[in-house]
Amino acid sequence: MSSGANATTIDVPETRAEAKGKAPLIAAPIVATTKATPHPNAGWKKGLAIFDFLLRLAAIAATLAAATTMGTTDETLPFFTQFFQFQASFDDLPAFMFFVVATAIASGYLALSLPFSLVSIFRPHAQGIRLLLIISDTVMLALTTAGAASATAIVYLAHNGDSSANWIAICQQFTDFCQSVSGAVVASFIAVVIFMLLVMMSALALRKH
Amino acid sequence: MSSGANATTIDVPETRAEAKGKAPLIAAPIVATTKATPHPNAGWKKGLAIFDFLLRLAAIAATLAAATTMGTTDETLPFFTQFFQFQASFDDLPAFMFFVVATAIASGYLALSLPFSLVSIFRPHAQGIRLLLIISDTVMLALTTAGAASATAIVYLAHNGDSSANWIAICQQFTDFCQSVSGAVVASFIAVVIFMLLVMMSALALRKH
């Protein structure tokens, strides 16, 4: 790791507060020195913040694709009996409903977090914003993972069925339905991976200041 | 938040490195001052680390309970036909198998992480350990959530069935099976909440040093 480079970091407001509290007489020259010297790892932090912003854009694309693909999935089979038509829609299955709601919330959250991510590009040492982002990212990671995993369990069942519980595989009839649902699940797992990366990167950025 | 108290934090090794790099002539008195004064927020950090350790113990209990409850679930109905007996076991359903594996892995990881958590009680400012813990906790949060959510989707189906996919509710027959499976799912969600808390607390602990 780059802890060697980080060891020379100086956080200006903190140094000032610390110096005021402890050694007021030598406070002024220290502050002057730190202000004159550019941050040694500001570039590294800025790179991390820019990557964070780009990852958020990718995650918006992934969650939006997942939510809309799942939310518009609807297949009516071309044959029907006297009493009912065979139709499969995402809102027949509560797990798919939850998936749409969870990925839509994640997508909205990501859009709202973009300005905060932008601020941390220009102020790489603002710890409050980083902390806010890492906490809400953790919650959203859990939400997106829950949506993706529950939908996966149902998609697996739709593909393979389960003989012991007497649940039949419906994908033999509803091929298009199963295909788009599987696509949505894959997109949501991409979003899960991105959320994990976002949390880890925020942790790295919080490490030194 | 306690940012007012944190603003006076001084990290001894970093202050020394920083002082050496920037202003060697006034480095010695500063280090002497900081060494004489105890850490203002060392107690707060230590409390956080102790709470982290206790939460890990609770999470071990929750994941162990979830894994063993699910892993020993097996119900044979008291009636049978000529050809087969009605039996429900967790390993009939892949989602339940995944649940057992995921919670068992989380449980093992938590046991392995205890020594690291202990070290960070005695050395609240060791950032490398915190960073290691937050990154692996994030991965485990995703794993445990995935296991819990996929099992929930199947448990919901077992309780309610799904008319459009023609999947019947099996809980009317397998009442004991469904009860213990539901208990395991609840325990795993407790573990998920604890993992989220662990990640957030590590983020807080990384914030200032």
Swiss-Prot record, chains A, B:
Cellular compartments annotated: Cell membrane
Q: Does the keyword Phosphoprotein apply?
A: no
Chief localization: membrane
User: Is this entry keyworded Cell wall biogenesis/degradation?
Assistant: yes
Transmembrane residues, as ranges?
Answer: 47-67, 96-116, 138-158, 184-204
Q: Which residues lie on this side of the membrane: Cytoplasmic?
A: 1-46, 117-137, 205-209
- Mind listing the UniProt keywords for this protein, alphabetically? Cell membrane, Cell wall biogenesis/degradation, Membrane, Transmembrane, Transmembrane helix
Subunit field text: Homodimer and heterodimers.
Q: What is this protein called?
A: Casparian strip membrane protein 1
The organism is: Vitis vinifera (Grape)
